Amino acid sequence: MAPQTAELHAVLEEFFAAKSAYDVESTMEFFAPDMVTYNDATLGWEFGSYAALEAVFAQYMPNWAPPARSYATKILAGTDSALVYMVDTPELFGGELRILAAVDFVDGKIVRWIDYWDSSAYDTGLYNQFRTPVDDFPSDLKDAQVLTAAAPELVKAATALQEAFAAADASAAAAAMHTDVVLVDMALRTQVIGRTETTRYLERVLGRVPYGHASTLRHIVGGREGGGFEWTAGPDTDGLVGITALELDADGLITKITSVYDSRQIDPAGKRSLVEASAP
């Protein structure tokens, strides 16, 4: 791990320690005063300023107590951005949230943070209570306001894979993959192992999964060894957004692909069909 990458990794670990200590002041020290946004893309919670984010932490943190935690299980960092696998325990927001987060830094401070997670196992009552109404749901995740600062090797791999996904071209996608690639769809609870089986799986689903046909690339975060790309699904899914995490080998080939999005927003019959497509 390069020194600058290790430094960002350490900063994020310190952030989660402060958040899990329920310390509003220490948590906010990690954010730039002119931050762009902190957004939960699943619930449509948008905090577009330092003051707005500080206010929501001040509202919730005094009610948290052990064993409530927010922690990272994997961090794929570059020098100025990262993809974070993270968990919010049920004591925080009423259910276990397994999140992929895109995080951008400027001068060592967080300027943009977007959480993506699948709500299908989350309590329906809480989901309906917390989710922003459709008419007010934010569609702009401010990716255009923050320049991509990901490693060139990651940008190359992410762009090639997303273009193949958008064209529903499984063979082109396979060209970017290591022979032992693992593909995970967190929303569909699907895992496929190996390039051969992954290619066959993609042939079956790229025309229908949100990250597939007609999807658009929005933003890339991470470093030489991995990160992720944010995307918007094609017109058939009403602007559903998601993220795909990537891990790379020394040659720039993709060794792991992990996608997440809110599958509660997909037609139930269509979701069942996609789940069934994991069977050869």
Regions found by a protein language model. Name each.
Residues A21-D80, A170-R224:
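A solvent-exposed, acidic/Ser-Thr-rich amphipathic alpha-helical stretch
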